[in-house]
Amino acid sequence: MKSTLRISLKAGERIFINGAVLRVDRKVALEFLNDVTFLLENHVLQPEGATTPLRQLYFIAQMILINPEGKDHSTAMFRKSITMLLSCFKNEEILAELKRIDALVSTGRAFDALKAIRGLYAIEDNILNNHEMPPTMVEQIRREIAPWR
């Protein structure tokens, strides 16, 4: 890390740091002086929120960050999922971004991958609402990724 990173948290807010979950009891500012892997609570997707193919991919990618002991399993599941999604989506913007997301995870930048996945949610919602991806395919993806839960 070339410079320090400062994060402000409100009372009761949680942050996931290197696999640990911290909750603060008052407004605090944290200053990270070295490299750290973290996720703010408002960016953590709960399993029940992983209801679409990209949200499932997001959930898996976040597990790479917040569960260091299971990183190898999470990464293997991510690889399987990204391969499946690349064969299922037809939208060029999503396909290009999925390839970039795969490269981000491959180079240890899962945090950046999460941000990129969130950026695709609106396009995915449009695709699913307009049935551009058959419901049977969405269900197949869900079943393939469901063992993760």
Swiss-Prot record:
Cross-referenced Pfam families: FlbT (PF07378)
The name this protein goes by in its record: Probable flagellum biosynthesis repressor protein FlbT
Function, in words: Has a post-transcriptional repressor function in flagellum biogenesis. Associates with the 5'-UTR of fljK mRNA and promotes its degradation.
NCBIfam families per record: PRK00794.1-1 (NF001995)
A biological process from GO: mRNA catabolic process
Keywords assigned: Bacterial flagellum biogenesis, Repressor, RNA-binding
HAMAP family cross-referenced by the UniProt entry: FlbT
Domain of life of the source: Bacteria
Organism the protein comes from: Rhizobium leguminosarum bv. trifolii (strain WSM2304)
UniProt cross-references to InterPro entries, sorted A to Z: Flagellum_FlbT
Family: Belongs to the FlbT family.
A GO MF term: mRNA 5'-UTR binding
